[in-house]
Amino acid sequence: MVVSQPITPGQVSFLLGVIPLMIAWLYSEFLEYRRSSFHAKVHSDKNLVELEMVTNKEDEGTVLMEGGLPRSASSKFYSSPIKTNLIRFLTLEDSFLLENRATLRAMAEFGAILLYFYICDRTSLIGQSQKNYSRDLFLFLFCLLIIVSAMTSLKKHTDKSPITGKSILYLNRHQTEEWKGWMQVLFLMYHYFAAVEFYNAIRVFIAGYVWMTGFGNFSYYYIRKDFSLARFTQMMWRLNFFVAFCCIILNNDYMLYYICPMHTLFTLMVYGALGIYSQYNEIASVMALKIASCFLVVILMWEIPGVFEIFWSPLAFLLGYTDPAKPDLPRLHEWHFRSGLDRYIWIIGMIYAYFHPTVERWMEKLEECDAKRRMSIKTSIIGISSFAGYLWYEYIYKLDKVTYNKYHPYTSWIPITVYICLRNCTQQLRRFSLTLFAWLGKITLETYISQFHIWLRSSVPNGQPKLLLSIIPEYPMLNFMLTTAIYVLVSVRLFELTNTLKSVFIPTKDDKRLLHNVIAMAAISFCLYIIGLILLLIPH
């Protein structure tokens, strides 16, 4: 096995952390097996990622509580000081390992997956092959997936709107997850097959994701009014926990996975817009002022030459990126380009979320109209939307990619709005969704990041994934089938593990404990990095 790049301190520090975790987990499994054998009692694990609450009382017996997806860590883990937990871990105390066996299992599995990433993308153990595009095959595979999804996962929903109390279901969760799912499939196939002719469509899909960032976060904060530190930390964990480890293990810049910093930025901007003077959010004029302020910030940042570079240059260490194939570009070029393409659409998402209750009430009244009037209004909406979509397609979408990118920030709302209108024009369309796509829509972040290393291949730090991972050489379709199956399975596990570990390390109602956890994780990471750096310097 040949390693393609020198080992970094970050990679050594990761191994220093993950190897003891794996040993501790294996030992905890042995302890559980020995205890179960001793008591002649078998405990079944319903889910490998569940968090177990174990209280080991020698005089009173043993109680093991398991079930479903994990929601909280063991009570002893939360109640014990971090220093005590760390000492108990390092000394391999039996009771501690048994109490936190499922947590150790989740951490060990997460580490093993990251090692698999490294093996696939940074060693010669698994081969690589060239991309090959066929429009016929590309469209065939996507249409086949739609047919299979429609035949096996079409589901009718009867959820009621929290606003109107009726089954209007305008832009409901099932629908937006489905939307993310089919866009993600095309986005991934675009990368796998190098389907460059769909470049402009992919730009619209990414705008759709950013639109949902504005729409979803605005809806949550406006309705729930939860601006707590725990909620904020949970968001940042969801967006950046996995990608941070990928940057360490693969020695990549954060901006290689540009979707993550983009969504982080626009999530922060929505959080700031609604969190500042949040007690006045119910006042329409205040909300109008906030949205106008968002537009003003974007105009100042992206439309006035030089401002972007001045503002972001102090963060070039985090947001800078150098493509090995284009080393002469400025470090902030990629961040400027990517964030600038979708600089307005998140605000459009906020506006649509703000008027969502109003539109639902309009739709409720429309459904109560007589059939003739209802049909004429819906026909008009479909006609106007289709005509607007046609004009956009003819005069914007058909432009070459360079010219299209200039218009994209100002026009991406058009196809998104057209899709929303057509997808929600009838009650029947709103009630049904393809749950296969909705399921895929829930793991878009994991599939986006994982594709770089276990589906595609770049082989070098910060390299774009120009190659395909090849487990079965000379059989491209069989290889596609196998690598895709592994890739999706790993993405699902990463989604579950990220949520599992989030529930362990981010308490929802204890900010003091949360702060202690953050400080402890930072201190442990720093110590491991220093040790890794020293170990690499010793040979020299």
UniProtKB/Swiss-Prot annotation:
Subcellular localization, as worded in the UniProt entry: Golgi apparatus membrane
Any GO BP: xylan acetylation
EC number: 2.3.1.-
Superkingdom: Eukaryota
Uppermost EC category: transferase
Membrane topology term: Multi-pass membrane protein
One GO cellular component term noted in the UniProt record for this chain: Golgi membrane
Expression sites (tissue/organ): Expressed in cells undergoing secondary wall thickeningin a SND1-dependent manner, such as xylem cells and interfascicular fibers. Mostly expressed in the middle and bottom parts of the inflorescence stems. Mainly observed in the more mature parts of inflorescence stems, but present ubiquitously.
UniProt note: phenotype after gene disruption: No visible phenotype on cell wall acetylation in single mutant. Severe growth phenotypes (e.g. dwarf and abnormal flower organs) associated with reduction in the secondary wall thickening and the stem mechanical strength in the quadruple mutant rwa1 rwa2 rwa3 rwa4 and characterized by reduced xylan acetylation and altered ratio of non-methylated to methylated glucuronic acid side chains. Absence of interfascicular fibers and xylem cells differentiation. The double mutant rwa2 rwa4 and triple mutants rwa2 rwa3 rwa4, rwa1 rwa3 rwa4 and rwa1 rwa2 rwa4 are also dwarfs with abnormal morphology.
InterPro entries for this protein: Cas1_AcylTrans_dom
Glycosylation positions in this chain: 132
Keyword field: Glycoprotein, Golgi apparatus, Membrane, Oxidoreductase, Transferase, Transmembrane, Transmembrane helix
Transmembrane spans: 7-27, 106-126, 137-157, 182-202, 203-223, 235-252, 256-276, 291-311, 340-359, 377-397, 407-426, 436-456, 470-490, 518-538
Statement: the UniProt record of this protein carries the keyword Heme: no
GO molecular function list: oxidoreductase activity; transferase activity
Family: Belongs to the PC-esterase family. CASD1 subfamily.
Biological role stated in the UniProt entry: Probable O-acetyltransferase involved in the acetylation of xylan during secondary wall biosynthesis.
Protein name, UniProt field: Protein REDUCED WALL ACETYLATION 4
Gene source species: Arabidopsis thaliana
Phylogenetic lineage: Eukaryota, Viridiplantae, Streptophyta, Embryophyta, Tracheophyta
